Regions:
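Hydrophobic residues embedded in beta-strands of well-ordered beta-sheets
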Residues: 1, 78-81, 132, 143, ...
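Short, small-residue-biased leader/transition segments that mark boundaries at the very start
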Residues: 2-12
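Short, aromatic- and glycine-rich surface loops/edge beta-strands on solvent-exposed regions
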Residues: 3, 69-71, 143-145, 243-248
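Aromatic- and glycine-rich beta-strand/loop motifs that create alpha-glucan
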Residues: 10-41, 88-139, 149-161, 195-240, ...
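Intrinsically disordered, low-complexity polar regions and short flexible loop motifs
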Residues: 15, 19-91, 134, 149-197, ...
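Surface-exposed loops/turns
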Residues: 139-140, 175
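Glycine-centered loop/turn motifs
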Residues: 141-142, 241-243, 307-310
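Short low-polarity hydrophobic stretches
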Residues: 176, 216, 246-248
Length: 331
């Protein structure tokens, strides 16, 4: 009867799922995924595992996190029905507002971890897959955090989590200063650590008992420099020696050594730095875990800069290069 047919129609269910029977692109980056990955397709029920989405299990995406889903069954947001989930690590993150440098957008970089042991010639340190960071100056005011998908993030200063905001959201800077800012998209927590100073450390291995430190000047965009510094090269029994690295001191007392990738700047690298692409790279170490001379650079053949003034420039951003770098020159 027409009534029975109507009841069957009312009871009939469908599920809204992935376009493939199995989610084969789940471990690919967002840029590499099939363009239809998040599109919603309407299916009649057959097998409970068919046409399901997966997270990136290889990267433990979303493990220990809470997830939000948005289902867009309209053509307002896209030509096709869409699924949006909040646990994916974004491809790009920016900060912008009245509190940021020149009120311009500040791009956060994939974070470089802070190491707790000295380096080695074969040191291989990659960027954190789910943590974004920047070194920047913030003024008293507001700023927003957005990602490549146009999502806004709201920081909770009480216990340091953050979350996707349902509407455009701003965050407040209570104290102007130079900061290291890091957002962990796996734990959904963040850190803001104020930087007290960045110094050049210069002390040869021998013949110079007292280390020389000189405060560097913040230049903006995560860069520091020092110019016309009287360079120290020791002389003893016909030998010469030079050593340097950089010390970042935070207001809370924690110190990072921004240093060379290996525990010692040995002959081949010291003699031909141009042959080693990571020679001028800056690596981050817990300063308290290292001996005094660990992970220090030397100048060319321990002789460069004798009787000259030195200029150093630090780039703790990915604008100058893909890695954190420094440059040096003598005149």
């Amino acid at each position: 009867s027409s009534s029975a047919a109507s009841d069957v129609y009312k009871r009939q269910s469908e599920f809204w799922g992935h376009f493939e029977d199995d989610c084969r692109d789940s471990e690919k980056s967002e840029a590499e995924k099939n363009p239809l990955f998040y599109n919603i397709f309407r299916h009649t029920f057959s097998n409970q595992w068919d046409n399901t989405w997966k997270v990136n299990e290889k990267e433990r995406e979303g493990y220990g996190k809470k997830v939000s889903f948005w289902v867009h069954m309209n053509n307002t947001d896209d030509d096709l029905f869409l699924l949006e989930r909040s646990l994916g690590v974004p491809l790009a993150v920016n900060m912008q507002g009245s509190a940021t440098e020149n009120q311009e957008a500040i791009a956060l970089n994939k974070a470089l971890p802070v190491l707790v042991a000295k380096g080695s010639d074969d040191l291989n340190v990659g960027r954190e897959a789910s943590i974004f960071e920047c070194f920047t100056q913030l003024s008293s005011g507001d700023f927003s955090i957005t990602d490549d998908k146009g999502r806004y993030y709201k920081l909770d200063a009480s216990n340091m989590p953050f979350a996707i905001a349902e509407n455009p959201a701003t965050n407040t800077v209570s104290k102007a200063g130079i900061y290291w800012v890091a957002l962990d998209f796996n734990a959904m927590t963040y850190k803001m650590r104020e930087i007290e100073k960045v110094e050049l450390w210069n002390k040869p291995w021998f013949g110079h008992d007292v280390p020389d430190t000189a405060e560097m000047t913040y230049q903006g965009q995560g860069e520091w420099s020092i110019s016309d510094y009287a360079w120290v090269v020791s002389h003893e029994d016909g030998r010469k020696d030079t050593r340097y690295y950089f010390i970042c001191t935070y207001v809370d007392g924690f110190k990072e050594r921004w240093g060379y990738y290996s525990d010692d700047c040995r002959g081949p690298q010291n003699s031909n730095p141009g042959n080693y692409p990571n020679f001028y790279n800056i690596y981050r170490f817990d300063h308290s875990k290292l001996e005094e001379w660990d992970d220090s650079w030397k100048t060319l053949n321990d002789s460069e800069g004798v009787g000259k003034k030195a200029t150093f420039h630090i780039y703790m951003n990915n604008t100058y290069a893909a890695d954190y770098k420094h440059t040096r020159s003598f005149k």
